[in-house]
């Protein structure tokens, strides 16, 4: 139970400190929207992607044409909550880094966001002191960051 309380608190601290730092230096950029969206939705989206991977594994490894796909459907709320609880701190870090760079909605920005997602995922794995977890969290963080960047970053003027 301890990490589920600690990670959202760390995410809140990262988001608030990052916003206060950036609001003074770049008031024209929507820092709050980018940081808040990444903090609140990044981990949950990662949990949703994990559920999708589990569903693909069930479908691919099913020996019969009648697939019992109720497992991923039952696991979806738990996965989103776990992803939101554990992944909110790396997602907040990614959101602060993207807001600091003042990125706009473009494919290059999505690639940069994916790179920051990889870095944040590796940091999350290192926090767990588990290198295989880093290898699992990195691509999930990259894909989650790229998807959110395509939706949240401001459009070019």
Segments the model singles out, each with a brief description of its role:
Residues 1-157:
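Juxtamembrane/disordered regions of integral membrane proteins
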């Amino acid at each position: 139970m301890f990490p589920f309380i600690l990670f959202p608190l760390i995410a809140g601290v990262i988001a608030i400190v990052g916003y206060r730092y950036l609001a003074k230096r770049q008031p024209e950029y929507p820092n709050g929207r980018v940081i808040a969206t990444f903090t609140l939705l990044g981990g949950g989206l990662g949990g949703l992607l994990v559920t999708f991977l589990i569903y693909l594994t069930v479908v691919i490894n099913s020996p019969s044409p009648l697939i019992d796909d109720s497992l991923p459907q039952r696991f979806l709320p738990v996965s989103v909550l776990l992803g939101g609880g554990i992944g909110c701190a790396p997602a907040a870090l990614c959101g602060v880094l993207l807001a600091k760079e003042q990125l706009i909605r473009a494919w290059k920005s999505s690639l940069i966001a994916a790179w920051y997602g990889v870095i944040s995922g590796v940091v999350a794995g290192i926090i767990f002191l588990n290198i295989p977890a880093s290898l699992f969290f990195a691509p999930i963080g990259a894909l989650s960051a790229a998807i959110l960047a395509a939706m949240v970053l401001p459009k070019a003027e």
